[in-house]
UniProtKB/Swiss-Prot annotation:
Coiled coil: none annotated. In the hair cortex, hair keratin intermediate filaments are embedded in an interfilamentous matrix, consisting of hair keratin-associated proteins (KRTAP), which are essential for the formation of a rigid and resistant hair shaft through their extensive disulfide bond cross-linking with abundant cysteine residues of hair keratins. The matrix proteins include the high-sulfur and high-glycine-tyrosine keratins. The keyword Transferase does not apply. This is Keratin-associated protein 9-6. Residues 4-158 are annotated as: 16 X 5 AA repeats of C-C-[GSVRQ]-[QTSPHN]-[TPSGYC]. GO terms for cellular component: cytosol; keratin filament. Sequence repeats lie at residues 4-8, 13-17, 18-22, 37-41, 42-46, 47-51, 56-60, 61-65, 66-70, 75-79, 80-84, 90-94, 95-99, 140-144, 149-153, 154-158. The keyword Repeat applies. Interacts with hair keratins. InterPro entries: KAP (IPR002494). Keywords: Keratin, Repeat. Belongs to the KRTAP type 9 family.
Length: 160
């Protein structure tokens, strides 16, 4: 595997393009002597941009699809994305005041109907306002396998 540093790199901070498949942008690598590219350790917050890698967990700058309640602030660390969010559940959105994942929304009498709102960067899931889990069920939020952003409104999908 190609290393992140070329001979002309600075000793402690190396700019490279070889992590594009993981980081989506040239990435700053703090350990230039031995760290291979395209590994989680190569990635810093500068890689939080659109077109996120589906197995990476990002902070709010990437509209994460991570299903666990706490995500790291740096990119390309898949440990908090072990479970994809393919169901209309609380996944980091404001669901009846909840910000953690895993519990169904909109079922309690104290909860208003909940939308699964997400920005879709290929390939992930998206449901926009109007896509009530009560009316659409689990088919509301489905993976997007289109080359660009897909949106869904009450189970009617469109891709831009």
């Amino acid at each position: 595997m190609t290393h992140c540093c070329s001979p002309g790199c600075q000793p402690t901070c190396c700019r490279t393009t070889c992590c594009r498949t993981t980081c989506w942008q040239p990435t700053i690598v703090t350990t230039c002597s031995s760290t291979p590219c395209c590994q989680p350790s190569c990635c810093v917050s500068s890689c939080c941009q659109p077109y996120c890698h589906p197995t990476c967990c990002q902070n709010t700058c990437c509209r994460t699809t991570c299903c666990q309640p706490t995500c790291v602030t740096s990119c390309c660390q898949p440990s908090c994305c072990s479970t994809p969010c393919y169901q209309p559940i609380c996944c980091g959105s404001s669901c009846c005041g909840q910000t953690s994942c895993g519990s169904s929304c909109g079922q309690s009498s104290s909860c208003a109907p909940v939308y699964c709102r997400r920005t879709c960067y290929h390939p992930t899931t998206v449901c926009l306002p109007g896509c009530l889990n009560q009316s659409c069920g689990s088919s509301c939020c489905q993976p997007c396998y289109c080359p660009a952003c897909c949106v869904s409104s009450c189970c009617q999908h469109s891709c831009c």
